[in-house]
């Protein structure tokens, strides 16, 4: 194994396919990690961020491991761009669930579990300025779509075009010298052209899917088997929405995401 950070190693975690060609093979997937090394005094104690990152990449790995497709090119993460992050972001939800944390997040000397008050503080901290962060991501998606839905070559003033694209989501006064477009590499050279919305859409999907588990128990074997059979094993053999409905029984809604991010609760409180 090679799970710890090395000086000459790229600083990221990833899931990778190892076998892609054969008549009939079991999927072989690796999760390449970059965890903090142990020291002379302590073992390798993972940060919450490292746990979340591992769960994220493990979700991608499960997508490949459970593949049951006829063609390798349609297996695992070979799906629509706005669907590929569902399994990975779904798994991240477990990182702040007490029932999950109590299975391994124990003090390395005393075996004491994380106090419930700590877990609650972690959950609340994740929702700090969640509504603002949501609007920020939505604004980036709107700008992306504004550029890539133009039927003709772009010849307009960049700052003015950007300002108009953001009319519906402006929260703060604009700075005259600011221009997001010139540093928005994701949609110019990063592979997210006309697809930046997929970040927020993936959150809608993973929150809705995890809510299904929360309603029935986060380790519910029946729901987990549905997730594996109806969604993970199918790869890109069907349209993503059809796969999701086969698993969930309905199309996703935004309510689960709003509740997870504390936005729905805040709105209700402000109305009271």
Regions found by a protein language model. Give the residues of each.
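Cation-handling catalytic/transport regions enriched in His/Asp/Glu
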Residues: 1, 5-272
């Amino acid at each position: 194994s090679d799970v710890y950070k090395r000086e000459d190693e790229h600083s990221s975690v990833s899931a990778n396919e190892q076998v892609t060609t054969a008549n009939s093979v079991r999927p072989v997937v690796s999760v390449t990690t970059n965890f903090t090394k142990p020291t002379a005094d302590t073992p390798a104690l993972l940060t919450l961020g490292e746990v979340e990152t591992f769960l994220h990449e493990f979700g991608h790995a499960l997508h490949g491991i459970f593949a049951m497709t006829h063609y390798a090119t349609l297996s695992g993460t070979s799906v629509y761009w706005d669907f590929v992050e569902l399994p990975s972001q779904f798994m991240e939800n477990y990182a702040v669930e007490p029932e999950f944390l109590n299975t391994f997040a124990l003090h390395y000397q005393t075996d004491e579990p994380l106090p419930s008050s700590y877990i609650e503080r972690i959950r609340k901290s994740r929702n700090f300025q969640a509504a603002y962060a949501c609007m920020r991501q939505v604004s980036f998606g709107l700008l992306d779509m504004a550029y890539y839905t133009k039927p003709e070559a772009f010849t307009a003033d960049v700052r003015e075009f950007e300002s108009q694209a953001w009319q519906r989501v402006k929260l703060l006064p604009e700075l005259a010298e600011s221009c997001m477009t010139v540093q928005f590499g994701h949609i110019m050279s990063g592979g997210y052209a006309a697809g930046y919305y997929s970040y927020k859409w993936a959150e809608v999907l993973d929150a809705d899917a995890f809510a299904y588990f929360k309603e029935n128990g986060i380790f519910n074997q029946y729901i987990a088997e549905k997730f594996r059979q109806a969604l993970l094993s199918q790869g890109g053999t069907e349209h993503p929405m059809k796969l999701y409905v086969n698993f969930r029984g309905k199309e996703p809604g935004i309510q689960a995401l709003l509740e997870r991010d504390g936005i729905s609760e805040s709105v209700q409180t402000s109305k009271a």
